[in-house]
Amino acid sequence: MVRAFAYEEIGETSTEAHASVEDNKRDRTRRVINYNLRSTTMISSLSKRLKIDECKNQDPEQNPNRVASSPSLCHVKSKRPQKGVSNKPILDMDFLNEEELEKIDRHYKKISDSDKGADVILVNSEGLQRKLKLKRWDMTSTSNYVLGSGWNKVVTENILETGTRLRLWSFHSPDMLFFALVLSDPDLAPTKDWECLNLLAKLTVETACLEASQDADTMSSLVSDTELDLELRL
């Protein structure tokens, strides 16, 4: 099922007519391009562009109220200096399953030294894969998800610079969470992102980590479930 991250809009407006036109364009694009991924719902909202802002090296603070926190997706440049998405709460957290949430929670609570967060594989448009860890950090007024244990290599390999516009999709193989990274050019036609996404899905299915998904039923279960636009600030 294809879903878009739902964000709380602050200071942004759009007309219903404009949203309807954009939805129709997305619907047509999916019908033409969607030959590798099986989508069951429309992306019903416009892509939200977010700016990755500095977390100012704040120390994580305990936040016992997990439900009330406002998590957002961000990345870690190194162990201490970290940077994250601006403080817009993610309203739809369904891109994580129960096992992944438990691993993230165990790392956050420091239950064991062996708890490192949830395993994630980031795939770029060339099919290059990088294993990362998805973790949770609580700041003074917000709770962030961070990508660590290899993000610096992602920046280098994809030549990411300040102001780079990129799009992250999440999807699951039978036992692994993937993030597909697509550099997003606002001047390109909307179909380009779908072409890149389908290419990523095809390349991912062919890798060794998805050997178990060679039968048709398992392969058909590989579906995109999250979309997020980001603007990188290093």
UniProtKB/Swiss-Prot annotation:
GO terms for molecular function: DNA binding. Keywords: DNA-binding, Nucleus, Transcription, Transcription regulation. Residues 87-185 bind DNA. InterPro entries: At2g31720-like, B3_DNA-bd, DNA-bd_pseudobarrel_sf. Residues 55-88 are annotated as: Disordered. It is found in: Nucleus. PROSITE patterns: B3. Coiled coil: none annotated. GO terms for cellular component: nucleus. Residues 60-72 have a biased composition (Polar residues). This is Putative B3 domain-containing protein At2g18810.
